[in-house]
Amino acid sequence: MTASRWIVPLLIGLAACGAGVDPAGAQQARQMLNGFRAEQGLGPVTASEALEAAAMAHALDMMRGGFFDHRGSDGSDVMARVRRAGYGACAVAENIARGQGGLAEVMGDWVASPGHRANLAMPQVTDYGLVRAQGDIWVLVLGRDGC
C-alpha cells in the first residue's frame, strides 16, 4: 500500500485517539521553507505525504516515549523511518525541535543553528514533511525520492 493510500486513515485515526499531531500550517510552512531556500539560490521543496508520515511517526514516538532524539525508541534513524513510510530516499535530513510555540519561532531557531540551517539548505532535497506534536515537539524531514 502506498503512503497516499494509508496516510488519510492514519490521520483520521490519530485525530480520533487524541494523539495530538497535526500537519504544521501547510501553506505557511511551504512559504517559509521555500522563501529561505530561494534566498540561498536553491530550488523549492514540495510537501510529501510519505515524509509527513515519517515525521509524524517520530514525533509521536518522542511524545509518547518522553524522549527527544534523532534516534527512535526502536533505534531507527531518519532513513529507516522514511523508507518505512514508503519513500525511496537517496538523500534525507531531519530537523527536530522542542518548545517553540509557533512555526515562525521554530524556523527562526533552525535557520540560526548551523546544523539545522545546513539541512534546510541541502541542494539535493526536493520534498518535505513537517509536523508538530503535543508538547511543541517539531519534526521536519527533507528528502529526495528515487535519485
Regions found by a protein language model. Give the residues of each.
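Short, surface-exposed glycine/acidic/tryptophan-bearing loops
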Residues: 52-102, 120
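Bacterial N-terminal signal peptides that target proteins for export
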Residues: 1-8
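N-terminal Sec signal peptide cleavage junction
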Residues: 17-19
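Disulfide-stabilized extracellular recognition modules
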Residues: 89, 97-147
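A short alpha-helix/helix-coil micro-patch that ends at or immediately precedes a cysteine
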Residues: 22-64
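Extracytoplasmic/cell-surface-exposed regions of Actinobacterial cell-envelope-associated
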Residues: 39, 43, 67, 77, ...
